[in-house]
Amino acid sequence: MMKKLLLAVAATMLLLSSCGTHKTVVGNSNIVNYTEAHNFFHIGDESRPIIKKITSQENLAKEFGEAAFMGKGGEPTKINFNKYFAIAYILPQTNRKTLLAPLSLTLKRKHLELQYKLEKGKVQSFFTQPFFIIVVDKKYVDYKIVEIEGWD
């Protein structure tokens, strides 16, 4: 009885691990690596959700200010625009508690799919402008970016 149970568990684990490995290999083939930039605030006032490509320090300074603070991790992310560019996804101002975060960036034939997580919460007594900035290898700068709301 114990041998049958052990054999069934081993067979199940083998089956699950072989399926998982295949999905990982196929699924990761078009993933584009990125780093999320931190400690910035948006200067403009967007009236609708928008994706912006930022290809220079000058463009970054026009769109975002540095929001440094004392302590570990307080410096704004440095971006080397000779090697990288930034993708900013910006929402209009809102008085709702909002979580906006990138989930993945995937290369499709002639475009990049930017998948993000958006959660809207309770009304607050103040307004914020949700956004995120990701830093991507410059070899992808000419691709169109398509947004896809996703789930974590």
Q: Model features per residue range: what roles?
A:
Residues 19-152:
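Exposed, flexible binding/inhibitory loops of compact, secreted disulfide-stabilized domains
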